[in-house]
Curated annotation (Swiss-Prot):
Primary role: An accessory protein needed during the final step in the assembly of 30S ribosomal subunit, possibly for assembly of the head region. Essential for efficient processing of 16S rRNA. May be needed both before and after RbfA during the maturation of 16S rRNA. It has affinity for free ribosomal 30S subunits but not for 70S ribosomes.
GO cellular component entries: cytoplasm; ribosome
Annotated source species: Chromohalobacter salexigens (strain ATCC BAA-138 / DSM 3043 / CIP 106854 / NCIMB 13768 / 1H11)
Protein name (record): Ribosome maturation factor RimM
Gene name of this polypeptide: rimM
Keywords linked to the UniProt accession: Chaperone, Cytoplasm, Ribosome biogenesis, rRNA processing
Amino acid sequence: MSHETGGADTAQDDEHVVLGRLTSPYGVKGWLKVYSYTSPIEGIFEHAEWVLSKRGERRACKLSQGRPHGKGLVASLEGISSRELAEQWAGADILLPKQALPALAPGDYYWYQLEGLRVETLDGECLGQVNYLFETGANDVLVIRPSEASLDERERLLPFLPDDVIRQVDLDAGRMIVDWDPEF
């Protein structure tokens, strides 16, 4: 499963996925610190054509250079050559057209594809919707939030274990079937 996701931001739309965020200027030549939602974090640099989104304004830009810096990342973008310009884009989301994402093998999914799916048990009971996912050492975990159709108001954490817990993912129907006891 690929970890490129939309994070918790609203800049994501039907055509774009949020890969990360520009956090603050770095130095005086227009470099910016980058917080990446990709796994590994350097994966954000595999995409040279970015769309920056901040407060409803969008700007297409090209990645000139990117590199690790300490525990994070820094990037230089074409057209942003001073600290003042970098400050204007600090806090911007880094978007990528979904069509630019690499194709995945059957049974693999990007996290953003799973977010919002209705989650049902093998017996057809609705547990809620996938709100978001997070990574643990052993496996990824789905956070299932209650919805209007869910059988109760409980939030659940389900391990993303294909064939064991996750029995079927139907993106077209917007549904995931899980082998999970609703009482757990």
